[in-house]
Amino acid sequence: MKTIAKFVAVAVLATGSVLAFADAGDLNIFHTIDIDAPADEVWAVAGNFGGIQRWSPGTESSRLVLHDRNETGAIRLLLRRSDGTQVTEKLLDYDPYNRRMVYTYVDGVVRASDYRSELVVKEIGEGKSRVEWRGQFRRLAYWTDNPPPGQDDKAALDFLNGAYVSGLAGLKKAVEER
């Protein structure tokens, strides 16, 4: 009986520490911008999963490589303007009724791991909209307390905060200048 009790105690302790480790490195960002256009007009631009290059200044090109329209499971290939690196992302959920999409990183050069992003367009009245863009991820070297240069929390946060802020500003400009 003592052997079983020891086994259960070890299993509980091991599980608890694994769960604590899994949550320890999560980083979150949230950005929002108000746009002088109805939500449906904003969604027509922002909700085109394969067309992010039309409004994101950091994206040189983007194309769907799996599925030819906005649907769950679609894969897009992005080419970054700054350094020409490629990133592949997958559309996890696409809800045009609520003007919401969720996507994740699949492959390529990225400065975070376990990346998941959600973009939502909301009507706020008087022909205006609010776009909310949130991301959840971990720094690249999440398993160590001493990550190499460029793989720490600050590097991941700086890169993705910059991408979201410039992306939202680009979306506002693209929609309002139509």
Task: Put a short name on every predicted segment.
Residues 8-11, 20:
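Cleavable N-terminal signal peptides
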